[in-house]
Amino acid sequence: MNADMKWLDNPEVFRVNQLEAHSDHTYYESYEALEKKENALIQSLNGQWEFVFSKNVKSRPENFYEEDFDAKNFDKIMVPGHIELAGYDKIRYINTMYPWEGKEYRRGAYSMESTGDGAGMFSEAEYNPVGSYIKRFDLDPELCSKRVRICFEGVEEAMYLWLNGQFVGYAEDSFTPSEFDLTPFIREKGNVLAVQVHKMSTAAFLEDQDFFRFFGIFRNVTLRAVPEIHLEDVWFRPELYKDNASGKLSVNLKVSAPENRKINARFVLKDQEGSVVLEKSAALQEKNGIYTEEIQTDDAQVKAWDNHHPYLYHVYVELTDESGNLSEVVPYDIGFRRIDVIDKVIHLNGKRLVLTGVNRHEWSPKTGRCISMNEMKSDIECILRNNINAVRTCHYPDQIPWYYMCDAAGIYMMAENNLESHGTFQKLGAIEPSCNVPGSIPQWKEAVVDRARSNFETFKNHTAILFWSLGNESYAGDDIEAMNTYYKEKQDGRLIHYESSFYNRAYEDTISDVESRMYAKPYEIEEYLDHDPKKPYLLCEFMHDMGNSMGGLGTYMHLIDKYDMYHGGFIWDFIDQALYVKDEVTGKEVLRYGGDFDDRPSDYEFSGDGIVFANRVEKPAMQEVRYYYGLYR
């Protein structure tokens, strides 16, 4: 198969040769390696790459992926990172509009009769920047003679991949991992990896979030060697009984190995003191080299997980061959908690759930959405310090470590899909969905369901996730209903959230387990709850903290005492989106916001809505948050 630039125009092509999404577990070949946290099966490709920027597809270096290509005119660029922050293209901040508005007329493929299939919309555009990357590497010794895969944890927005002159695959969805099998093409030494990243494709219509519009390889890139017997996917399903003191655990395993092998799996659940709570073994059933099993445990005494007591158990899954030799061990931390809706009121472990939440973009004033572990840890500390008990991953999946941090800290999560098509149904504030995507357009359905699948499969084992969110501000139609159906069929006990069905009540019974609003006034909340409400109510966004804001928080919080079906909400938002630049006059480092980069169209200082500044200094409004949230956390 050869790479085809026309895929950029086609909403039905969003992954080519990608491996299936799977759980985000790590794996080791021995307990010794696990205890030392030294994983010789992983090789990072982060660091300096060769790079060239092109204005559009036709001016890109077409044959740059060939092994004998002369890249002497290429620059150097650091991965991970945004191409714009390396000095290429233009820095742009936009809220609802698409970056081409006022410059080019574009409507999503098949969204209007006049649009047709959108052929050439992005592949032949005069402006659609391309970043061509080359990484040369030798395999670490421990990866040799094994199956080798590559994982890109985040690439905006569409990417083509080659290794040693051979086409490997294509991916969209900027914020979930894209993984490919390199085994047929890789060698021990002298590998040439080539990645071509396109700023816009049909995925641009689905990624119209309120943020700076960057592109490039902005999250980690790793090679992963796969043992002969390998746990491809694991789904831990802890069940907490109504006494909040006992429960059981189901474990679904999917293992790859050569055919006709006798493979055994054993899992052990230990408490924080190291005592064994549950233990069970099973022989795996094989079909075409894939071995599966569902293991059910007996009942056991367990401790419940919640925001005040985020108790996690340590699980270890061992895979052994027919001789009893250990092939792989997988660690994971899980908690026991129970979500119920009783008389239209959400309960966690039998108690009414109150959300003192915040929406959180991933942001660094120096590196944009390419944030560090220290910045994530700082955010966790700030959240706990100020009585915030929940985060919404607006409006895309976050880096994988963030979910583990929230599990450990007891921070409730609304895990949102990478979806916002705001600009296709809202024009300068007016609701006008004539060209909405995905809507009910068949050609867009699989792309958005795939985003739901990637979100679920990657993060399904995280105790902190109480809600799956279908996306943000994308109107409502059959395609989003299909996403809702996908999550429902998983029956994982979590609730499904979506706000924009408010604009299309034809779907209110088939999309979302909650009535969700953004920026509803207090009297509007009361009006809904006073008139035979159908669902529990929450605010996915409220208290827009732009400028000197947050003064009305108490009015909203007092409604929690008045209405059991009102569950609080998520402040917009956690952190200002602003970038450090050197001031032209003083030479000092200052923060600049949307519109400060001569970016048009722009929504200007609308990028500054946080309860902390971009440098993570708390704003004066935080004292309101800390006080009122402290009354209900």
Predicted features along the sequence, with ranges:
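Accessory beta-strand-rich segments of carbohydrate-active enzymes
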Residues: A3-V16, A21, K36, E50-S54, ...
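Beta-strand-rich binding/interaction modules
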Residues: L161-L163, S246-L284, E293
